[in-house]
């Protein structure tokens, strides 16, 4: 859209916002929506945004106006401050304005957080009281727009000076929250520590702030089951960020020596699940997801120790099917080979396990003898598509599918089960085609053209037709 039109629309809205009662809230809401649409396709805003920002600030800091779409106005503010030069934004929203807003009602807190989240450079407010006030607000007993505050942390904690302001200048507050008995405030503390851990270097790491002890993990169960869930999620995040090679600054494996010993607390909780009944009822999935993350650590001996001491993976464990569906298949291959060979079967109830086994080339070799056309085609069609979606996701299993399972490929292309009415199954089948067509014509061989033709039919909504010449040739 032409710049002059944007400027005209912004000026028009600014004028209306100066006297919203005179023009009516319907007119204001309509102009806000139109400008939001106009700005939605822009990557920067060269027009002078100061009059509009000033008018928006005036309305947002005034008393609440009946019928005004404050959500839409805040969304527009978010868009404008992201597109406009930040020095322009600061001409309207001063440091004191932001602090005053943070100490006001929720609407003004959201307004100031919109501005803070896009501040440039990110360390701009590191020498002011803004982060101190924001932390006091975040850890206060009053109801606050938590997501808006956390958006600021997510944006600004990438900067070292901001992190220093939080970790050093506000150390007493963090220590207080570290030992609080308030489940809600401690959960917020864990969120903040998760955000910080993603970006800190070794010199910033403080064990007493970042690593809850074994006793604290066990105590969280006594306080609140949902607090325990947040602790389990926190430890999972620590492990993921500590071992992520793509993380900013590289993996933080130097933190593992502090994190790993505490994992025994979670193993103990699993082993004593009859004692911790609430875990089985409400937190089982979160505990298992944490254990799954441990199973994928490069040093498999960490998980092996938990397995031997607490998990006892075997055919006698009532959770064995769940374990086989989520734990690192390479770990299962190395330490529970006999379990895999004795338990693997191709049937709908085993589908979660099959998906996990297919993902690893070594465990897929164990599955091959059972992965026959008759075993697959006897499954309900939607389950067939789930399995084929997984088979078509990896080169080793795709090769087996296209070379060794012609009846399955034929059934996929010709849709011999008849018309599909369930939208989910239609999407699953379409995804299988998309997965397969990522491979070259050389890999797909005679199936390439039939797959491409049928995928075209799917996308255009045409009726499928049987390519008998391909089926007859390959069967």
Curated annotation (Swiss-Prot):
**UniProt cross-references to Pfam families, sorted A to Z:** HSM3_C (PF18794), HSM3_N (PF18795)
Q: Where's it found, cell-wise?
A: Cytoplasm
Matching entries from InterPro entries are given as:
HSM3_C, HSM3_N
CDD domains the record matches: Hsm3_like
Q: Which GO terms describe its biological process?
A: mismatch repair; proteasome regulatory particle assembly
* Major localization class: cytoplasm
Gene Ontology molecular function terms on file = protein folding chaperone
Q: Which UniProt keywords apply?
A: Chaperone, Cytoplasm, DNA damage, DNA repair
Q: Name one GO cellular component term.
A: nucleus
Its biological function?
Answer: Involved in DNA mismatch repair in slow-growing cells. Acts as a chaperone during the assembly of the 26S proteasome, specifically of the base subcomplex of the 19S regulatory complex (RC).
Family membership noted in the UniProt record:
Belongs to the proteasome subunit S5B/HSM3 family.
This protein is called what?
A: DNA mismatch repair protein HSM3
- Species of origin reads Eremothecium gossypii (strain ATCC 10895 / CBS 109.51 / FGSC 9923 / NRRL Y-1056) (Yeast)
- Tell me the gene name: HSM3
